[in-house]
């Protein structure tokens, strides 16, 4: 795996999955090689845009403005430890879910997918993650929004 412009994005593979980590706004070409086969993909990194109106975790609401500069929020694990909480991502107008919502424990090698607004068991200790991928309906820009329970 390689990136033609490593200052824009870093590319790497773990097991059979390929990753590109954005570093700054710009364009790069990601190249993946396997044996005699080479595949290339153009990647455009855009400036982060907040897609969140609010997030509800149990009875608590996280204001959308908390996501203005970063696509993640740290939530108190001890407050929800070993409980089930309904988690709902409320998106701003013009944004849609790519898939549903995924959650995983820090030591899992898998994740579980559920619908937005599902009741999720918060367990496994600090490092529990809830994540969703969303897309801007007009521009096609995608953002991964995450709750990290610490």
Which role does the model predict for each range below?
Residues 1-150:
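Extracytoplasmic soluble-region selector
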